[in-house]
Structure formats: C-alpha cells, structure tokens
A protein has these predicted regions:
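Long, highly charged, low-complexity intrinsically disordered interaction regions
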Residues: 343-415, 451-506
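Short Fe-S-cluster ligation motifs
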Residues: 103-117, 362
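Flexible, acidic/Gly-rich N-terminal and inter-domain linker regions that tether
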Residues: 1-72, 448, 456, 464-493, ...
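Canonical Radical SAM [4Fe-4S] cluster-binding loop centered on the CxxxCxxC motif
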Residues: 67-96
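Short, charged beta->alpha transition segments
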Residues: 66-68, 96-107, 285-286
Length: 506
C-alpha cells in the first residue's frame, strides 16, 4: 500500500533524507565526459566535477548530489523499493527546492554536480516536464554551469526529451534488464520498445549535432582504440554490425536487444528526431543558451542477479548497446533484495558484488582492450569464473597464443596479456625503440608481473621457469586473487553507501 503524504507533512531536511536514500540504488560512478569549463558570471565547472575522486565502499560515486525528484510512482516494478504497492514514506521536491539544494551544496563543496532521477508521478510526460523545469531553472535562473546527469523517463514526449538533452551533460535511460522476457516478468509497466525508442532518438540527435559542428558522428573513445582493428568501435566491427542488422531486419520485431539492436527497427528510426527538429522542439528561452546536445553522451544501467540471465546475455546486450546506440557507458548494479516476491531472490540473499565486478572488468575489455563479447563468453560457457578476472580466464582458454614476446608483439597483442594495460602496453611499444628491456624495466612501466610472467617472454626468456599449463597457472592466479575476491564478495558487510548524514547533513 502506498503511504501518500503531501509535501507540507515534511520539512526540506526530511524530504532530503527520504529522497537521497531512495536514489542510492541508481549507479552514477563515472567521470563526466564533458570538457566545459567555468565561465564568468556562472556557477560550477563540468570539468572538475566528473573526476570521481570520492567513492563509497561499494564503489558508488558520491561527487554528485544523487537524488530523486519524487519517490511516488505509479509503476509497480517488482525489484524497486519505490514501487506503487510498497508501504514506504513518500515525498516530492518542488523544482525550486532541488535548485536551492544543488546550489547551496555546491557552494559548500559537498557536491560537484547533480544526478537527477525520479519515480513516475502521474505519468511519464508530467514527470519529465517537472524534471526539465528543474534543469531549466538551474541553467538560467541560477546560472549553474556544473555537471548534470539526468535519467529520462521512457514514454515522455519528444519535446521534453530534446529539452533534457540540451540542458543536461549526460542523459540516460535505464534498460534495467537485458531481455523483453525479464521486463515482462519484473517490470510489467515497461517494454523494450518504450526504453529503446528514446535511446535511439538521443543517439541520432547527438550524432546529428556532432556532424553539424564538424565532428565525427560517433562519441570519442580512448586513443588506443585506433590501433585495435578487432575492437567493437573499429570501422570493421561497425560494418559487420550493420550487415548483421540488415540481415535480421525481417526478423526484427518482437526480438530482444541481446539478439539485435533496435537501431535497425524501422519504428525507432521513423520516430527519431534530427538535430534541426530537436532544436525546433526546444523552448525559445532555452535554445538561446546555445548548448551542445548531451555533450557527455548517454548511458544505461542493468540490474544483475534479479533474474536468471547469464553473463553471456548481459555482455552481448552490452556490446549491442555500444555499437547500436553509441553509449558512453553501460553500468551494472548488483541486485539487493528489498521486496518479498516469489520471482525475486529472498530478502537476505547477498548481492552478487563479485559478479558485478567481473562484468565491469569485461566491459572494460570491450571498450579499451579490443575484445569482442563472443571471445570472452560463449553459449557453452555462459558465465565468468568469479575466481579469475575475465582477461586471465580468456588467456587460460587460449594458451596456444602464449607466451608473447614483449620486444616484438604489437600493441593489440600486448593488451591481451594479463597484467598489461593500455598505458603499460604503450610504454613498452615506445621504450623498445630505444633499447632492450628486462623484467625490471617492465615492472617500472606498470606491468603487473604476478599475472603477466606466466604469459610473456622478454628477450626470449621467461621470468621464472613455469609450465604453460592451464591447471597449474589457474591455481597460482586464484591464489594471487583470493584476497581481492574475498574483499569484493564481502564488500557490503559492515559498509554502506555514504549518505548526506555522513557530512552532518540530514
């Protein structure tokens, strides 16, 4: 049952306690991706705010004021603490209240930006209208130039989606679950179509705006990606992806995003608005701000452990989202059982934090290391070995490619060695132009030798005489990572996400 109370029953401090606590399950641990610096006569700086220097013990970023506009919700998603059928305290901020909180907290150096989300108040369009009012007040009346990440509401009108894109640095639509079946099971008020449609509109508008100012239609990626010809952002992979979409066009309707991207869906393409259309949709008092459209791109979030989807399904969905919608980030949130329901894990079940960690590592391999999802997992092996990081797991299944000689290997080959990252691989490639290397110099370059020495040679020699045998190396690597894995799996014991009360507020 809903506990409905009007705003006069709560003070600002009480609302803050309720709505900041209700927002903690939204993931926002990322740099802003925006390079807009402070300007004379305006408040805030989008450059410094997104550095993510403050994290809670569970990895969530606390540099943003992460808050809900309201936790009233007409939807009844089974996994959500704010679902309509739950008996919880309900509160709603007015636009002015959120603006005042944001500005005052920024002046006191508590926060460096705003992460704004909301439950569904009345209907999606009404809710999104109120959220856009908040953003417009911050940018115009309060001259707030800091970083803003807004969660858009699926089902809201195109005009409001365009307004949010102009006013915020990053916009996102939570996918929540990777399959239509999962959504039908746990979120009966949502459909894959209503989620992917605004995602496609935002992507097309970002691309159109970037081309209008002389940039590539695709978001900027790590500079190292230009050397990864097999990576998911390479021209070859993009062409292969488009061919797959074309071949599946006839079977598109009614399929899951994990099988194909909605970008090839004619319904989505027809409803996507162009840059000029978005500009015309923007209110006149907003369009004169001459802002970029979502300069930090868009992101999404998927819940881990609420349903039975495998890591393979999640990772395939992730790759399709990156390639089909040019997302800047995909976030994963280990499900914390909060509601009693026969289709959900029992209350008290530990959240799969280590699994979440492995998915983030795999996501990193897709974005920076040139891996494809089907290289890391297959239908026959659909889940990661939680005792090993995904890169080590892949290397152990492909020992025929090792050892790699560091003095002759390409940048792409070095990146596939456990313990070698983009920075250390780049340093190796640059250093070997000036002389020979040894394992001491590799360590100084940042190579993690406790993992890498099993898979590399330097000058034709191994660091130690170790057998290139899967069982032996697996046992050694599991022993090395055991302490880290235990800490990750038990990260929620004795710790919790920092709240405003930790700063003496609320």
């Amino acid at each position: 049952m809903n506990t409905e109370m009007t705003n006069e029953h709560y003070t600002i401090q009480e609302k803050l306690h309720i709505l900041a606590d209700a927002a903690k399950y939204d993931v926002a641990c990322t740099s802003s991706g925006s390079s807009r610096r402070g300007q004379k006569g305006e408040l805030g700086n989008a450059v410094s705010c997104g550095i993510c220097h403050s994290f809670a013990a569970d990895g969530r970023c606390i540099s943003l004021l992460k808050i809900l506009m309201t936790n009233h919700c007409v939807y009844d998603c089974k996994y959500c603490i704010n679902r309509a059928s739950n008996d919880v305290k309900r509160a709603t901020f007015t636009p002015e209240e959120i603006c005042n909180l944001t500005v005052e907290f920024y002046k006191r150096n508590y926060i460096e930006g705003l992460f704004l989300s909301s439950g569904i108040l009345k209907n999606p369009t009404y809710t999104m209208e109120k959220m856009c009012e908040i953003l417009l007040l911050l940018r115009t009346k309060y001259h707030f130039n800091g970083y803003i990440h807004v969660k858009t509401i699926p089902g809201a009108s195109d005009e409001l989606l365009a307004a949010a894109g102009y006013l915020a640095d990053r916009v996102s639509v939570n996918l929540e679950l990777p399959t239509s079946e999962g959504l039908r099971k746990l979120a009966p008020n949502k459909t894959m179509q209503t989620i992917l449609s605004p995602m496609g509109k935002v992507q097309n508008t970002i691309a159109a705006h970037r081309m209008a100012i002389g940039k590539s239609s695709y978001m900027e990626r790590s500079r190292g990606n230009q050397f990864l010809h097999n990576g998911i952002f390479s021209d070859t992979s993009k062409q292969q992806f488009q061919k797959k979409l074309e071949s599946r066009a006839a079977l598109q309707r009614g399929t899951d995003v994990s099988k194909t991207s909605a970008q090839s869906n004619p319904a989505l393409l027809d409803s996507s608005f162009t840059w000029n259309q978005a500009y015309q949709l923007a209110p006149h008092d907003m369009s004169r701000l001459k802002r970029s459209f979502a300069p930090a791109g868009q992101s999404t979030q998927m819940i881990i452990g609420a349903t039975g989807e495998s890591d393979y399904t999640l990772l395939q969905t992730t790759q399709q989202l990156y390639q089909g919608f040019d997302l800047k980030r995909v976030f994963y949130s280990a499900y914390i059982p909060l509601n009693e329901d026969p289709v959900l894990p029992e209350i008290g079940t530990p959240p799969p934090l280590l699994r979440e960690h492995r998915l983030y590592q795999a996501d990193w391999l897709l974005r920076f290391y040139g891996f494809q999802a089907d290289e890391l997992l297959t239908i026959e092996k659909p889940n990661f070995n939680e005792l090993l990081d995904p890169k080590c797991d892949w290397a152990l299944r492909h020992l025929e490619l090792f050892p790699v000689e560091v003095e002759t290997a390409s940048y792409a080959e070095l990146l596939r060695v456990p313990g070698v990252g983009p920075k250390s691989a780049s340093r190796i490639v640059n250093a070997r132009r000036y002389g020979r290397m040894d394992f001491t110099s590799l360590k100084k370059m940042g190579v993690v030798l406790k993992r890498a020495h099993y898979f590399i040679t330097c000058g034709g020699k191994q660091m130690y005489h170790t057998p290139l045998e899967e069982t032996y190396i697996t046992r050694q690597l599991v022993s090395v990572d055991r302490k880290e894995s235990w800490k990750m799996a038990h990260a929620n014991e004795g710790f919790s996400q920092m709240t405003l009360a930790d700063f003496g507020i609320g």
